[in-house]
Amino acid sequence: FLPFTRSFFTNFKEVGNLPEKYKKKKIHVGLPNNKRINTNFTRKKNTSKKLIFIYGGSQGSENLINNFLLVIKTISNNELDQLKFVIQCPKKLNIILEKNLKNLNVDYQIKTFFNDIDNILSKTDIAITRAGAGTINDLIRHKLPSIIFPLPNSIYNHQYYNAKFLLDNKSCIVLDENNLNLNTYSKS
């Protein structure tokens, strides 16, 4: 779209891989924030279990779910008893995911979409996500530590640069889903 637009808005001042000829079209507006919503969130800690929220945004959550299934099978039962998973999952994976989680006797909630994202994020201890602009905005607003898997084929590699912003501010771990093995997870 860049060749055809007069200008475009960005959340971040720095836009990686933006061709020089389009930089004059960029208008930095910052992160979206609905003034009617309180952005001073009080973290509602789950006292009994750590809440892990897994969501892939509008695209790309299938690989997150598949990687999650690989990793969760390596976690001990004692550790799993201390965790609750809230998972946004594509409908086509619900049955497989639910079967695996039931077999592991895991505390979980699965939906294809959550309308109450701010409520969930206020209770979340760590998020496992993609790096779309909306997701990054949510993570920043909630000051939420995260493990981020940028969508590898995002245009201009923008998800990597979105994630790098949080990485540079020591707010996340960034993992490349194309170069993962279980040793990668154990180090994280």
Q: In which residue ranges do the predicted regions lie?
A:
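Short alpha-helical segment that forms part of, or immediately flanks, the ligand-binding pocket
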Residues: 118, 136-144, 164
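Acidic, glycine-centered active-site loop in nucleotide-sugar glycosyltransferases
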Residues: 143, 160-172
